[in-house]
Amino acid sequence: MSKEKVILAYSGGLDTSVAITWLKKDYDVVAVCMDVGEGKDLDFIHDKALKVGAVESYVIDVKDEFATDYVLVAHQSHAYYEQKYPLVSALSRPLISKKLVEIAHQIGATTIAHGCTGKGNDQVRFEVSIAALDLNLKVIAPVREWKWSREEEIYYAKENGVPVPADLDNPYSVDQNLWGRANECGILENPWNQAPEEAFGITTSPEQAPDMPEYIEIEFSEGVPVSLNGEVLKLADLIQKLNEIAGKHGVGRIDHVENRLVGIKSREIYECPGAVTLLTAHKEIEDLTLVREVAHFKPIIENELSNLIYNALWFSSATQALIAYIKETQKVVNGTAKVKLYKGSAQVVARKSPSSLYDENLATYTSADTFDQDAAVGFIKLWGLPTKVHSEVQKSAK
């Protein structure tokens, strides 16, 4: 009698490899690894899943879909959770969940498994997303169920022939994709400890970065980054290239004590060189092209959208409504930003746009000025009228 199939979100690490061995007692395990730009050896991961006991192993390249359908939303909405975290891991979980559900439907599986612990945000993101896409799918979380210590997990792995990674003594827990790299655990758990250089993986220390600045130009079309230094690139490729260029200059290091969805505080080290550079450049083009009312209201939407995405609600109607608003604002966001990369900083030093609302003839203080200064007198009287009336009423009441 054949076993029921379970779709496992597989990373190739110890947790999900041990999960295969544990799950295969009752299920035929189908391991699925998504390539969201983390730079892993995908052939090795594919083969390892089969070696450990999966009946099928899938490695799916979703970098382009991740960039255009998920990262772009965060980019255009300047998504920083608590004004610091560019939602690196939070962005990939809805896409991974979507693909797991699609594969479950394709092969007729009714169960999905993930390797999250019981104290992180990702368990919530996976399970809420999966439920939003198919309420009938069952979700199991072996790592959360075991509650094993690391030592117990290693012992189980060795007893069951699961290869134990050579770098298992690495104290850090790392997650990486196109939009950045997240690092936690080990010495980082004490917020008084400065993050050692070994905790960083894709950025150069600003102190060791080049002593000469580098200037780059990023072009945007309707809010989408379309070219880097004149070279037209797919969004995923552009981000990866920016990660290398800006990372070399130490851009995008973030040290954050954040409020997790599950109720605890966590100290995280993020490296987001491409993200920080793009977000900085994009904001400057918006400053040229958005009318004042949109420019002032959009940050309110951005903050709420960042919270919704962080808090596992990508597929909620609220999130989708706010995304629609963001997309509407981007129709005029066209132009090029020149960015100076130097010693950990990404600074926009020049910008231009065919949709620019900046009129130099109105702004200038030279003889070329076309601003009607005489109109200011009447404007001031009308603008200040409510304040004047209020002041007079207060005086008469005394």
UniProtKB/Swiss-Prot annotation:
Q: Output one GO MF annotation.
A: ATP binding
Catalytic activities: L-citrulline + L-aspartate + ATP = 2-(N(omega)-L-arginino)succinate + AMP + diphosphate + H(+)
State the EC number(s): 6.3.4.5
Q: Which GO terms describe its biological process?
A: argininosuccinate metabolic process; L-arginine biosynthetic process; urea cycle
Pfam families, sorted: Arginosuc_syn_C, Arginosuc_synth
Residues of the signal sequence?
A: none
Q: Which residues are noted in the entry as L-citrulline-binding?
A: Y85, N121, R125, S173, E258, Y270
Q: Which GO terms describe its cellular component?
A: cytoplasm
Tell me where on the tree of life, at the top rank, the source sits: Bacteria
The UniProt keywords, alphabetically, are: Amino-acid biosynthesis, Arginine biosynthesis, ATP-binding, Cytoplasm, Ligase, Nucleotide-binding
Give the InterPro entries listed for this entry.
Arginosuc_syn_C (IPR048268), Arginosuc_syn_N (IPR048267), Arginosuc_synth (IPR001518), Arginosuc_synth_CS (IPR018223), Arginosuc_synth_type_1_subfam (IPR023434), AS_cat/multimer_dom_body (IPR024074), Rossmann-like_a/b/a_fold (IPR014729)
Q: In which pathway does it act?
A: Amino-acid biosynthesis; L-arginine biosynthesis; L-arginine from L-ornithine and carbamoyl phosphate: step 2/3
Predominantly, its location class is: cytoplasm
Residues reported in the UniProt entry to bind ATP: A9, Y10, S11, G12, G13, L14, D15, T16, S17, G115
Binding, L-aspartate: T117, N121, D122
Q: What class of enzyme is it?
A: ligase
Where found?
A: Cytoplasm
Q: Which family does it belong to?
A: Belongs to the argininosuccinate synthase family. Type 1 subfamily.
Question: Tell me, how does this one assemble?
Answer: Homotetramer.
Protein name per its UniProtKB record? Argininosuccinate synthase
Organism of origin: Streptococcus pneumoniae serotype 2 (strain D39 / NCTC 7466)
Recorded name of the encoding gene: argG
